[in-house]
Amino acid sequence: EFRRVLFRSYAMKDNPDFSMLVGPEEIMAESVLLGAHGGVNGGANMFPELYVSLYNAAKNADMEEVRRLQEKVMQISATIYTVGQHGSSYLKGLKCALSLLGICSDYVAAPFHKFEQRERGKIWKALQNLGVDVVLR
């Protein structure tokens, strides 16, 4: 799947009538380096500056900066999006983190349920490890 996304990014990069946006933020920089136009990245709701900087570094082919910023994106992915045991862990982790940051509620529509206090504590710890000062609510 990853190779298909990258191939399409490269194949469509010069087509002015087509925009290629990737969803998985873990591959946004690589896709932009190959011609994609950007990403639809959930983590940008938490850390907009990080994702804009990563996009700009990829657009400018600043590989040192891409590597530095990509490490942070991968840390977010590995710590916030993996709490829980179900496929919904990405969404629930994101919503929980946004709630802890005071951005929005951690409400998720049925059939999902928001994280319990134990999982919220793990998200809080992940945010602390990312250097974010948050109050556990």
Predicted regions and their residues:
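Hydrophobic alpha-helical
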Residues: 7, 22, 30
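Short beta-strand/loop segments at the ligand-binding rim of alpha/beta enzyme cores
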Residues: 11-21
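Structured C-terminal cap/extension of enzyme domains
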Residues: 14, 26-137
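Short, small-residue-biased leader/transition segments that mark boundaries at the very start
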Residues: 1-6
